Amino acid sequence: MPNQSQKPVDIGGQAVLEGVMMKGPDAIAITVRRPDKTMVVDYKKSEPLSKKHKWMGLPIIRGAVNMVNMLVMGMTTLETSAKMLGTEEEEPTKFEKWLAAKLGKSIDKVVMGVAMVLAVLLSVGLFIVLPSLAEKGILSLGASGTVATLIGGLTKVLILIAYMIFCGMVPDVRRTFQYHGAEHKTVYCHEHNLPLTPKNAQQFTTLHPRCGTAFLLIVMLISIVLFLFVGRDITNAALRMLVHLCLLPVVAGVSYEVLKGLAHSESKIAKILRWPGLQLQRLTTRQPDDGMLECAIISMNVALYGLPKDAPRTEEGWAILTSYEQSEPDYVFPQKDEDKQ
């Protein structure tokens, strides 16, 4: 086990289909529990972009880079987890086949690309177009740019909350929210230097200050403040929308710095400011069972220490584990009798 006196490194993660992804300093691990109760693990080295390009690690810039990275990584990990789950894939549509042939790309890459484009369009539609239309309506009534900006910002927050509530009504999404809770509990366990076990992890809350849900809320609030000073007097709805889009990387960059600052501070002011983000997570996390925590623990250990030695593999190359204990750093798989001969 790791040295209990060492300060734990920051590690983040994401809930996926029937599992959890964890991202360590230089690797990503995804653990998925299949219907037969076994767990399969995908492990990839992942060097931060800031190591290759120092400027990407600069304050503000790193936040904008992180936003793009979150979107891309989120889609790719969900796609990987779907494959790892072992469920039958849907037959590609004629359009997907045609597009793959025209672009010279695999159908999987085309489907993922289309999904990413749709996700971006949905986000822009919900959180930029609709609020801009609300602002346009307020301006047409003779309200000031300041009032219109405040109404637009409030609309964004309400849409975000409504979207999360709606998602929580879907049974499969609720289960994913449980894995989200498992991710947070495991991260807390790691941060407190406790042995990673379901029993230890269960004692922690599902609400974590560095969660992406809190980041989204901070983005909304920072954008409201920024747009009170930039572009508030623009009456043309299309131009206001364009200005908001162009400033999105700046908003994301500032929001990232605020999130990190609040998460690592124990001052009374920081606790008060991060409270709304923690409460919003009640919509995107649920209490996990021990099996879900096992998946999160495996991903945590593998992301930090690598795959177990001599782990059996699937045909696709994923490691097969039956217990979270098999992922502990010093664990060595026992040899079978026939292997000893």
Which functions belong to the PLM regions below?
Residues I107-G125, F204-F229:
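Transmembrane alpha-helical segments and their cytosolic interface motifs
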Residues M1-G86:
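Divalent-cation
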Residues T80-M84, A119-S144, V219-V243, A252, ...:
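Juxtamembrane "helix exit" motif at the C-terminal ends of alpha-helical transmembrane segments
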Residues P2-D10, A15-V16, S50-G57, E96-M112, ...:
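Cytosolic juxtamembrane amphipathic/interface segments immediately preceding
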Residues E88-I138, S144-V170:
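Hydrophobic alpha-helical segments characteristic of transmembrane helices
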Residues T31-V32, D42, N66, M70-A101, ...:
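Short, charged cytosolic
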Residues L58-T80, I151-F177, L248-H264:
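Hydrophobic alpha-helical membrane-embedded segments
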Residues P2-G12, V16, V20-M22, I138, ...:
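Polar-ligand-bearing catalytic/cofactor-coordination segments
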